[in-house]
Amino acid sequence: MKHKLFILQAAQPSTPGTKQRGFSLVTTLILLVVVTMLGIGASQISLLAEKSTRFARDSQIAFQAAEAALLDAEFDIRGPNTSAAQRLSTFVTGNSVGFVDGCGTGAGLGLCLPAASGAKPVWYAGTVDFTDDSTSATTVPFGKFTGRTLSTGESGIRPEALPRYIIEIIPDGTPGLNATTKPTLYRVTAMGFGPRKSTQAVVQMILRKE
């Protein structure tokens, strides 16, 4: 009878070098993940900074366009104005002809009576759409009655559309003034646009014409 001899060999214990190589691999992977996350975070911060800068620039362009519309309205009301479309005779003391509820059209474009006491102002009530540039719009585009021009367009760093304004005639409540001779007050509200029309700025002034 033959007997088979089995020799059992004990497993060799791992050497310190093997453990170190495994630890180094894990450490490298962790560092790689950390560096990747830092890179993604830096990219996002850079993108947000770029968007913030662009928004600030576009808002500034819209604000400057709105201020330009206020100045255009002042020329419309006070002059000097040599445009064939000028309407300086409308803005005389005591005259409210052409000013209507909801703002006028034609020669009276953008001329508005103030809202009733306790009601929302005309410029805030939603009855006036400053973004409407159609033929039925009730706001005045820059240069309409003054002949002045402003560069606009969808390309370049400039307003996409012309700024627009309305003019409300409002009572002067200054005590002691004669009702028949006191100066007329006009409240001008203007909206300007940035390189994208969705970027908007609204400014307002009250103008007293002596």
What do these predicted regions represent?
Residues K2-A11, K19-T28, L32-V33, L38-E210:
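Terminal alpha-helical segments
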